């Protein structure tokens, strides 16, 4: 029984992570999905949130912000195809707070249907980025 599984996390811009993991937790549309080696095959959509990776061989847990995309689990490999993926330590907290504030302001101003949906999506992404930053703080302290 394998104790690790290969993980590839890629966005449209770059490969964010490629390596062995002991555990991966992803923000699936219907709730968080936890994946250990030998997990059953799976394909699901992911929503904005924190992708948590327990790196193999005693590596520390990594937090990666994912804006959405697809997750595929096959024997021996997990692939995350993300719309946007940013390593937790690369996130800009000030920009995330400002994006959250701007989205909340747009929602308060009773934006039209399309603008309202966009503001909700932007708020969701900003909150997910802030959640990733907070999770990173917890794992480093």
Curated annotation (Swiss-Prot):
Top-level taxon of the source organism: Bacteria
Molecular functions (GO terms): ATP binding; proton-transporting ATP synthase activity, rotational mechanism
Cellular compartment(s): Cell inner membrane
Keyword entries, A-Z: ATP synthesis, Cell inner membrane, Cell membrane, CF(1), Hydrogen ion transport, Ion transport, Membrane, Transport
SUPFAM superfamilies xrefs: Epsilon subunit of F1F0-ATP synthase C-terminal domain (SSF46604), Epsilon subunit of F1F0-ATP synthase N-terminal domain (SSF51344)
Chief site of localization: membrane
Membrane topology of the entry: Peripheral membrane protein
InterPro entries listed in its UniProt record: ATP_F1_dsu/esu_C_sf, ATP_synth_F1_dsu/esu, ATP_synth_F1_dsu/esu_N, ATP_synth_F1_esu_C, ATPsynth_dsu/esu_N
Gene Ontology CC entries for this record: plasma membrane; proton-transporting ATP synthase complex
Similarity comment text for this entry: Belongs to the ATPase epsilon chain family.
HAMAP family: ATP_synth_epsil_bac
Subunit structure and binding partners: F-type ATPases have 2 components, CF(1) - the catalytic core - and CF(0) - the membrane proton channel. CF(1) has five subunits: alpha(3), beta(3), gamma(1), delta(1), epsilon(1). CF(0) has three main subunits: a, b and c.
Function: Produces ATP from ADP in the presence of a proton gradient across the membrane.
Annotated protein name in UniProt: ATP synthase epsilon chain
Originating species: Methylobacillus flagellatus (strain ATCC 51484 / DSM 6875 / VKM B-1610 / KT)
């Amino acid at each position: 029984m394998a104790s690790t599984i290969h993980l590839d996390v890629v966005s449209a811009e770059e490969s964010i992570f490629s390596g062995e993991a002991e555990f991966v937790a992803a923000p699936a549309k219907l709730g968080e999905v936890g994946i250990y080696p030998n997990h059953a095959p799976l394909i699901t959509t992911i929503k904005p949130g924190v992708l948590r990776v327990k790196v193999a061989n005693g590596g520390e847990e990594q937090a990666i912000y994912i804006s959405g995309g697809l997750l595929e689990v096959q024997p021996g490999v997990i692939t995350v195809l993300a719309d946007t993926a940013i390593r937790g330590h690369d996130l800009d907290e000030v920009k995330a707070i400002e994006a959250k504030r701007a989205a909340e302001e747009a929602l308060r101003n009773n934006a039209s249907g399309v603008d309202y949906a966009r503001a909700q999506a932007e708020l969701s992404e900003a909150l997910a980025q802030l959640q990733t930053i907070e999770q990173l703080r917890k794992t480093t302290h």
